[in-house]
UniProtKB/Swiss-Prot annotation:
Pfam families linked: Helicase_C, SNF2-rel_dom
Lineage: Eukaryota, Metazoa, Chordata, Craniata, Vertebrata
Subcellular location: Nucleus; Chromosome
Entry function: DNA helicase that possesses intrinsic ATP-dependent nucleosome-remodeling activity and is both required for DNA repair and heterochromatin organization. Promotes DNA end resection of double-strand breaks (DSBs) following DNA damage: probably acts by weakening histone DNA interactions in nucleosomes flanking DSBs. Required for the restoration of heterochromatin organization after replication. Acts at replication sites to facilitate the maintenance of heterochromatin by directing H3 and H4 histones deacetylation, H3 'Lys-9' trimethylation (H3K9me3) and restoration of silencing.
Residue numbers bearing the Phosphothreonine modification: T54, T71
PANTHER family named among the record's database cross-references: SNF2/RAD54 HELICASE FAMILY
Residue numbers carrying Phosphoserine: S57, S79, S124, S127, S132, S146, S152, S211, S214, S239, S242, S302
Every Helicase ATP-binding domain range: 509-677
InterPro entries the record matches: CUE (IPR003892), Helicase_ATP-bd (IPR014001), Helicase_C-like (IPR001650), P-loop_NTPase (IPR027417), SNF2-like_sf (IPR038718), SNF2/RAD54-like_C (IPR049730), SNF2_N (IPR000330)
UniProt cross-link Glycyl lysine isopeptide (Lys-Gly) (interchain with G-Cter in SUMO2), position: K77, K84, K335, K471, K724, K996
Keyword terms: Acetylation, ATP-binding, Chromatin regulator, Chromosome, DNA damage, DNA repair, DNA-binding, Ectodermal dysplasia, Helicase, Hydrolase, Isopeptide bond, Nucleotide-binding, Nucleus, Palmoplantar keratoderma, Phosphoprotein, Repeat, Ubl conjugation
Segments forming domain CUE: 157-199, 251-294
Name this protein carries in UniProt: SWI/SNF-related matrix-associated actin-dependent regulator of chromatin subfamily A containing DEAD/H box 1
Length: 1026
């Protein structure tokens, strides 16, 4: 019987079997093909056999006498072959562990085996992915026997195979099954022999059924597309699949062994069930078990450095193993407790599963349970969810209904029109019979409710943590000892922390003591850098000498190095920055221990730009990783986010002045980054519940307001935010002013022409390069006409391209190519080009055209007034080309200025800043919003002018706070230039709605200090005597 006939044999036998509910076996992978482990004695006996390097499964198939090896000679059947039908195909799988492992009972057969001329040998190499993942493979040598070094793993593999056979043949004794395992080399061979000897596997159906018992269900071992295979003409392909399934089975067992080393209290069968729930993804199962172990206070033995890994409580060492098994089954079983079943095309394992407990212990289970287990039976919805779904569909607003998966605005409108839903039957009938709706929305509604439950569980757990922090401070204060960490003595004695900075230092020490990570989110200008340095000094005094890592934007690296050397010269700082060759030398020094350092300072780009950079910070064991301008990690789906998550640090601290920017999901991304072991198992639910767009106050539903309240509850223990108006009473005020600028006559004509042309293109669904960024095209025209090409017509460009041939640098150039290059240039770029080349000098634009902008007319008047008052100006723009045109304006009006943008060398930036702060005759500092809006101190200026606003208002706030920060002595005026009747007015409105979200998140309850919990803030102040 070849493999194809064996499959048919299983299929036909299965159709004849009566249904037996007590047996629902299922191998863990398609096709139970697996290599067998041998004892040391068997391996030694193997060494005496000289044979061809052929798998035993093939030998068994081709041998004339295929009786079970344990059968006595006198009882063996003569000349009967069950594996004779397949024509001379031998399969050698180099990725299998059992290639060279043969039972002694088969050794004589091996010696006599030869290949005829019709034999085809198929050799399968292990894939690169298998080798790169470090999956166990046997060492391969010609005509030699591979050796298994770890005898304990041999026993574990044998136990695993025994467990698989027991599930298939529950009525057979362990001794019978062990004999079969020892007599064959693969799982396929053992199962085939067992089918011939015992007749059938367990006598029960393999079709999945809903368990009626109270015990948690045991997963079936055959999926629909695993149990029955279609007829194949190509037997070689079938052999490949059989060998591949054998390899997959062994990989799974190696993953089980690896996981058991991390969790010795768990049985292997329990770990298999968990891995099945997570589609055999080791990292996901590990994270889930870690969360479960932490919630149940169980033992977890870490074999590697894990972020936030803390010592396990001593009482967990004696945690009963049977209790572990019970708890684990309760956590990962679904079907016996959930009657929610629904038909699906295919059974898919979902890594996100959660059990709805009758009594919820706050914070005991944060994972999600959104996987519905499907069977072929009728749909059943448990009563608990019926009431929740009925109540939700009856009372939810249209906006809330659209949160249901696959529920559009139109469907939500129809649901509201079908109300009221007086009963479950009425709801089901109305949804089924209404055009455009279906009963699937009811099942999807359960998914939404479960997602809400996950968020509520996170809230409860976070509330517990917050209460613990409060209790800790209360206890210390009550005992009279107080919680007061003074300024570390190794800080520069000539400098002192401000009172609110001492509170920040104490808060950082408090969360560190409780094994948490945090986000220091003080408003820009309150000295987050100083508080972070003071915290590192505190750790140094406590005996934690590092190494620590500080990741910063490129524009602030010089400032960080200066501040660390100024505030805490005791800390030895290593700057990981420079070219690839320079960084290579630094890496060599680090690995060779030539460098003596406590802190490494690097940039976001240098930390992850190459595989060598990423490898360094994965291998280097860091104590704290501090990320400045942490809002750069607001997108959990970005490559930067994923790479930085791999940094091997015990603790993480984020510094950001704008934790909330566009939506609440960005804030949740930051929380997931600093506390991955707590939030990573719920990222999909968090993404759905907090990713909706920000709305104005009058458009917010009750649920959206609740969402904000939920987010505030979750972030409470992990974030500290103070605003300047509350902690810096002496800081001068900041005033905002909106200047609506009417466009010039020519500019307005050009803007309307562009608008109509783009609108026509949209209506005609035309695809062209101009439509790639309609918004950007309108923004550029609203700022200045020279950002487009209007004045240099095609005729002018052709004439200019001919004249360019007279230039020594272009005498042999092709005029057509010059013309093509000029076509894509803007008017101002062409104007600059005309200034560079003598023969086209006459084509320069007049100064009147350069200054022909509505914003320039207003800006000229504002600058004249400010100069007369003695004010100094910091002028920001989004576009570097706009800065080029602004330079022409400033020169025209004879204003002294400096300029800093993304092209400015990092080494030069600090000198430009110092020059502006010391030379009071410099009137204007030109900055690009991206490059000059982060970590720069320009308190010598008191007026900020935003020539063009950003789509993200927090980028503009960052720019404003270059002046409005500690050290400012004058009132700060912020002026925003908005072109009237353009897209900029819509941008301004949207930005105001985004800022409203931050106000909602940081709304101060009575007694609060910022968004920090009121009790903790007050207690810390009281304890410190402030």
């Amino acid at each position: 019987m070849n493999l194809f006939n064996l499959d048919r044999f299983r299929f036909e036998k299965r159709n004849k079997i009566e249904e037996a509910p007590e047996a629902t076996p299922q191998p863990s992978q398609p096709g139970p093909s697996s290599p067998i482990s041998l004892s040391a004695e068997e391996e030694n006996a193997e060494g005496e056999v000289s044979r061809a390097n052929t798998p035993d499964s093939d030998i068994t198939e081709k041998t004339e006498d295929s009786s079970v090896p344990e059968t006595p000679d006198n009882e063996r059947k003569a000349s009967i072959s069950y594996f004779k039908n397949q024509r001379g195909i031998q399969y050698i799988d180099l990725s299998s562990d059992s290639e060279d492992v043969v039972s002694p009972n088969c050794s004589n057969t091996v010696q006599e085996k030869t290949f005829n001329k019709d034999t085809v040998i198929i050799v399968s190499e292990p894939s690169e992915d298998e080798e790169s993942q470090g999956l166990p493979t046997m060492a391969r040598r010609n005509d030699d026997i591979s050796e298994l070094e770890d005898l304990s793993e041999l026993e574990d593999l044998k136990d695993a195979k025994l467990q698989t056979l027991k599930e298939l043949f529950p009525q057979r004794s362990d001794n019978d099954l062990l004999k079969l395992i020892e007599s064959t080399s693969t799982m396929d061979g053992a199962i085939a022999a067992a089918l011939l000897m015992f007749g059938d596997a367990g006598g029960g159906p393999r079709k999945r059924k809903l368990s009626s018992s109270s015990e948690p269900y045991e997963e079936d071992e055959f999926n629909d597309d695993q149990s029955i295979k279609k007829t194949r003409l190509d037997h070689g392909e079938e052999s490949n699949e059989s060998a591949e399934s054998s390899s997959n089975w062994e990989k799974q067992e190696s993953i089980v062994l690896k996981l058991q080393k991390e969790f010795p209290n768990f049985d292997k069968q329990e770990l298999r069930e968990v891995l099945k729930e997570h589609e055999w993804m080791y990292t996901e199962a590990l994270e889930s078990l870690k969360v479960f172990a932490e919630d149940q206070d169980m033992q977890y033995v870490s074999q590697s450095e894990v972020p936030n890994g803390k010592e396990v409580s001593s009482r967990s060492q004696n945690y009963p193993k049977n209790a572990t098994k019970t708890k684990l089954k309760q956590k990962f079983s679904m079907k016996a407790q959930n009657g929610f079943n629904k038909k699906r095309k295919k059974n898919v394992f979902n890594p996100k599963r959660v059990v709805e407990d009758s009594e919820y212990d706050s914070g005991s289970d944060v994972g999600s349970s959104l996987d519905e287990d499907y069977s072929s039976g009728e749909e059943v919805m448990e009563d608990g969810y019926k009431g929740k779904i009925l109540h939700f569909l009856q009372d939810a607003s249209i906006g809330e209904l659209t949160l249901i998966p696959q529920c559009s605005q139109k469907k939500a409108q129809k649901i509201t029109e079908l109300r009221p839903f007086n009963s479950w039957e009425a709801l089901f009938t109305k949804m089924s019979k209404t055009n455009g709706l279906s009963e699937d929305l009811i099942w999807h509604c359960k998914t939404l409710i479960q997602e809400r439950d996950v968020v509520i569980r996170l809230m409860n757990k976070c509330e517990d943590i917050s209460n613990k922090l409060t209790k800790q401070v209360t206890m210390l204060t009550g005992n009279g000892g107080g919680w007061n960490i003074e300024q570390p003595s190794i800080l520069n004695q000539s400098l002192s922390l401000k009172p609110y900075q001492k509170v920040g230092l104490n808060w950082l020490a408090l969360v560190h003591k409780h094994g948490l990570n945090g986000i220091l989110a003080d408003e820009m200008g309150l000295g987050k850098t100083i508080q972070a340095i003071a915290f590192l000094a505190y750790l140094y005094q406590e005996g934690n000498n590092g190494p620590h890592l500080i990741v910063v934007p490129a524009s602030t690296i010089d400032n960080w190095l200066r501040e660390v050397n100024l505030w805490c010269p005791t800390l030895k700082v290593l700057c990981y920055y420079g070219s690839q060759e320079e960084r290579k030398q630094i890496r060599f020094n680090i690995h060779s221990r030539y460098e003596d350092y406590n802190v490494i300072v690097t940039t976001y780009n240098c930390a992850i730009s190459s595989s060598d950079d990423r490898s360094l910070f994965r291998r280097l064991k860091l104590n704290y990783a501090i990320f400045d301008e942490g809002h750069m990690l607001k997108n959990m789906g970005s490559i930067r986010y994923q790479h930085l998550m791999t940094i091997n640090a015990n603790n993480r601290l984020l510094l950001t002045g704008t934790p909330v920017q566009n939506n609440l999901l960005e804030l949740m991304s930051l929380l997931n980054f600093v506390m991955p072991h707590m939030f990573s198992s719920s990222t999909s639910e968090i993404r759905r519940m907090f990713s909706s767009k920000t709305k104005s106050a009058d458009e917010q539903s009750i649920y959206e307001k609740e969402r904000i309240a939920h987010a505030k509850q979750i972030i409470k223990p992990f974030i500290l935010r103070r605003v300047k108006e509350e902690v810096l009473k002496q800081l001068p005020p900041k005033k905002d002013r909106i200047e609506l600028c009417a466009m010039s006559e020519k500019q307005e004509q050009l803007y309307l022409g562009l608008f109509n042309r783009l609108k026509k293109s949209i209506n005609n669904l035309e695809k062209n390069t101009e439509m790639c960024n309609v918004m950007m095209q309108l923004r550029k025209m609203a700022n200045h006409p020279l950002l487009h090409r209007q004045y240099y017509t095609a005729e002018k460009l052709k004439e200019m391209s001919q004249l360019m041939l007279k230039e020594p640098t272009h005498c042999e150039a092709n005029p057509d190519l010059i013309f093509e290059d000029m076509e894509v240039m803007t008017d101002f770029e062409l104007h600059v080009l005309c200034k560079q080349y003598r023969h086209i000098n006459n084509f320069q634009l007049d100064m009147d055209l350069i200054l022909d902008s509505g914003k320039f007319r207003v800006l000229g008047c504002i600058l004249s007034e400010l100069k007369q008052k003695g004010d100094r100006v910091v002028l920001f723009s989004q576009f570097t080309m706009m800065l080029d045109i602004l330079e022409v304006l400033l020169k025209h009006h004879q204003h002294r200025y400096l300029r800093l943008d993304g092209k400015t060398q990092i080494s030069e930036r600090i000198h430009l800043i110092d020059e502006f702060n010391t030379d009071m005759d410099i009137f204007v500092f030109l900055l690009s919003t991206k490059a000059g809006g982060l970590g720069i101190n320009l308190t010598s200026a008191n007026v900020v002018i935003l020539h063009d606003i950003d789509c993200n208002p927090y980028n503009d706030k960052q720019a404003e706070d270059r002046c409005h920060r500690v050290g400012q002595t004058k009132e700060v005026l912020v002026i925003k230039l908005i072109s009237q009747g353009t897209i900029e007015e819509s941008m301004l409105k949207i930005n105001q709605q985004k800022l409203k979200l931050e106000q909602d998140m940081t709304t101060v309850d009575e007694g609060d200090e910022g968004s920090m919990p009121a009790d903790i803030a007050t207690l810390l102040k009281t304890s410190m005597g402030l």
